Amino acid sequence: MEPAFGEVNQLGGVFVNGRPLPNAIRLRIVELAQLGIRPCDISRQLRVSHGCVSKILARYNETGSILPGAIGGSKPRVTTPTVVKHIRTYKQRDPGIFAWEIRDRLLADGVCDKYNVPSVSSISRILRNKIGNLAQQGHYDSYKQHQPAPQPALPYNHIYSYPSPITAAAAKVPTPPGVPAIPGSVAMPRTWPSSHSVTDILGIRSITDQVNDSSPYHSPKVEEWSSLGRNNFPAAAPHAVNGLEKGALEQEAKYGQAPNGLPAVSSFVSASSMAPYPTPAQVSPYMTYSAAPSGYVAGHGWQHAGGTPLSPHNCDIPASLAFKGMQAAREGSHSVTASAL
């Protein structure tokens, strides 16, 4: 009994759209083709479309199968747990191995054959997704094992002082007599000198150079200046009565220990030994300016009653200021005339 659903083709046969042809009809098509019947005659005899007959016969000639479905079926899985295990072993032995080298080793060791060996892209994906995290975790664990233990930093309290390389280096620094020693808890750490530091540019010796110096004493550092008071400096002279001299002596005593290469304050001239500046001559702002001080500046209609032709506003001009240029010119002309005679 034929099914109730289906469609009828041009030849009068019944087929179901989207469903494969039954296996019995497929087998009959192959048998008629082996008897030498043409595909067009098979199509009319079995009432099956010509395209369906041609497709079934072509697939049978290529694969030898009359079953429906994709030719060859789905590809079997190649990334089995055994293959992944061997890939992980190869990667751990040689972290710099490439994917194509792993593929060759899988074939050489007999883990896979040429039909089920994974491709280079599949091996790269396995290394990235499944083995990459494990390799990074292993490197991190090995780094933590070989990492040295952290050294203790500066103690948080000067009462509970713990031994550290910084305090040991600070203990080797000699302390001159008369200067209190610096506690180890606040000692400055030793730093490597830099060629571009301020101390090298200015030519100031660093603390490390002072420690390596053979002399038993070293120049005072910044920490030692805080411990020095005014009692350590010599007092002023008793005969100093003037306040200015007393201040100058205090500055000389205070800055007497200047570093090498810098002049001391005592080498400069004191303010008391300098002569006062001369008082400038008072000149009226209404003075007439001319190209040269000469007698051609005659009287004017607006000349002052008590003034002179050279000073119409009754302002006195010193002779040395007014006629200095004229006198020099006159002396020069007399010397030229005498030499000509």
Curated annotation (Swiss-Prot):
Protein's UniProt keywords contain Mitochondrion: no
InterPro entries the UniProt entry points to: Homeodomain-like_sf (IPR009057), PAIRED_DNA-bd_dom (IPR043182), Paired_dom (IPR001523), PAX_fam (IPR043565), WH-like_DNA-bd_sf (IPR036388)
A GO CC term assigned to this protein in UniProt: nucleus
Cysteine pairs bridged by disulfides in the record: none
UniProt keyword terms in alphabetical order: Developmental protein, DNA-binding, Nucleus, Paired box, Transcription, Transcription regulation
Primary site of residence: nucleus
Compartments, record wording: Nucleus
Stretches for region Interaction with KDM5B: 168-189
Keyword Transcription among UniProt keywords: yes
Start and end residues of each stretch annotated as RED subdomain: 82-130
The entry's DNA-binding region: 4-130
Ranges for region PAI subdomain: 7-63
Gene Ontology molecular function, alphabetical: DNA-binding transcription factor activity, RNA polymerase II-specific; RNA polymerase II cis-regulatory region sequence-specific DNA binding
Pfam families found in the cross-reference section: PAX
Assembly behavior: Interacts with KDM5B.
Purpose of the protein: Transcription factor required for normal development of thymus, parathyroid glands, ultimobranchial bodies, teeth, skeletal elements of skull and larynx as well as distal limbs.
Name used for this protein in its record: Paired box protein Pax-9
Naturally occurring in which organism (per UniProt): Propithecus coquereli (Coquerel's sifaka)
